[in-house]
């Protein structure tokens, strides 16, 4: 499609099979007469990684939270410091071994080398969170079709990860049942509603009073439904499901033990982020600041790709940019990546390219 052959890739994974824990590692500095080296860092992280784990689980990520040198805590980078004893607090993400093997098999069949697995919530974090939010404490909520991936950052470090088996597809199902239409029609209605209502300028209640009926005649649905009541659609169908979603998110935040450490609130991203009533309902249930997260950390992308549904995909590219160097340059300027798309229909091709990677 783009004229580029894919030989390797970073793969995002998420869903209920994801779990996490925090671990502590301790080692003696290899040469106390010299500074702490990168080798010392690797050894202490490996010590933290040495946890008792079932054969059905596999570690996919180990993120250092902070280092402790001779009892001095709160160190973000210990390289170059002097000390005898080096410790580290880490956050470890694990996944189902079976699920990972099945994914590996697919990539092997395609002739694509899997560079690494990355939790999709962490990938989205790379694309939409600011360093300030991470330092203050923030919750990243990636709402996909059938799952919600959650990452909590405290003091600049990933400290908790989980996945909730609930997502935007459940809202679509509710609309299909409530309006007695097919799932395809329900999805079209949901997306159409999201485009019609600007969540950042007025609440859904205000809009519903001004425009009580939503005209969906232009969608040309097979059920021949021309309009629906906004009150029924928003208050009767969508809002109850959103309340349930945010109650699960709230319970997960409380379960993490970091509920009092996230003053930056929630950043909602993913394909379900623009669902009508998302911000209003979230603020009511969670009681914290909430914003919609879009991937704005890259240059050269057309506006259609600066969208919450592409956060995880953009995050994977940014993650790869940190780990792979092509020549002497990274991938910060995406104009060169897209230059081989033909002018005619390039926008559609680009959008379809990204949609291949959306779960």
Which residues fall in each region the model found?
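Nucleotide/phosphate-binding catalytic cleft detector across ATP-hydrolyzing
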Residues: 1-140, 157-159, 182-184, 188-234, ...
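Residue-level signature of catalytic and energy-coupling elements of molecular machines
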Residues: 11, 107, 142, 175, ...
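Glycine-rich phosphate-binding loops at beta-strand->alpha-helix junctions
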Residues: 13-14, 95-96, 195-198, 261-285
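A short acidic Gly-Thr/Ser loop motif
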Residues: 13-15, 140-147, 153-154, 165-169, ...
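A conserved active-site cap/scaffold subdomain adjacent to cofactor or substrate pockets
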Residues: 165-189
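Feature representing long, continuous alpha-helical segments
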Residues: 173, 232, 236, 240-247, ...
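Alpha-helix capping/termination and helix-coil
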Residues: 179, 183, 197, 241-260, ...
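Catalytic phosphate/nucleotide-handling subdomain of diverse soluble enzymes
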Residues: 278-305, 310-311, 318-323
């Amino acid at each position: 499609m783009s004229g580029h052959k894919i030989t390797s890739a970073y793969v995002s994974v998420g869903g209920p099979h994801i779990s996490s824990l925090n671990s502590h590692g301790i080692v003696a500095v290899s040469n106390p007469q010299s500074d702490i080296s990168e080798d010392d860092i690797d050894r202490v992280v490996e010590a933290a990684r040495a946890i008792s784990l079932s054969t059905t689980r596999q570690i996919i990520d180990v993120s250092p939270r902070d280092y402790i040198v001779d009892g001095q805590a709160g160190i973000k980078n210990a390289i170059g410091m002097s000390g005898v004893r080096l410790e580290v607090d880490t956050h470890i993400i694990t996944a189902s071994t079976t699920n990972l093997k099945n994914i590996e098999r697919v990539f092997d069949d395609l002739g694509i080398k899997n560079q690494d697995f990355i939790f999709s919530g962490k990938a989205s974090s790379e694309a939409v969170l600011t360093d300030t939010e991470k330092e203050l404490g923030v919750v990243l909520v990636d709402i996909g079709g059938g799952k919600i991936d959650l990452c909590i950052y405290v003091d600049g470090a990933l400290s908790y990860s989980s996945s909730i088996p609930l997502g935007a597809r459940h809202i679509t199902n509710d609309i299909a049942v409530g309006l007695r239409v097919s799932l395809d029609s329900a999805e079209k209605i949901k997306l159409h509603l999201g485009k019609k209502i600007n969540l950042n300028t007025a609440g859904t209640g205000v809009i519903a009073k001004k425009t009580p009926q939503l005209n969906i005649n232009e969608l040309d649905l097979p059920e021949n439904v021309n309009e629906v009541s906004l009150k029924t659609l928003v208050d009767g169908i969508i809002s109850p499901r959103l309340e349930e979603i945010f109650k699960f998110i709230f319970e997960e935040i409380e379960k993490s033990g970091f509920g009092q450490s996230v003053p930056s609130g929630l950043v909602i991203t993913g394909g379900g982020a623009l669902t009508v009533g998302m911000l209003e309902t979230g603020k009511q249930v969670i009681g914290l600041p909430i914003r919609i997260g879009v991937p704005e950390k890259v240059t050269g992308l057309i506006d259609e790709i600066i969208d919450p549904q592409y956060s995880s995909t953009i995050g994977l590219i940014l993650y790869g940019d940190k780990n792979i160097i092509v020549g002497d340059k990274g991938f910060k300027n995406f104009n060169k990546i897209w230059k081989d798309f033909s002018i005619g229909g390039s926008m559609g091709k680009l959008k379809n390219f990204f949609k291949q990677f959306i779960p």
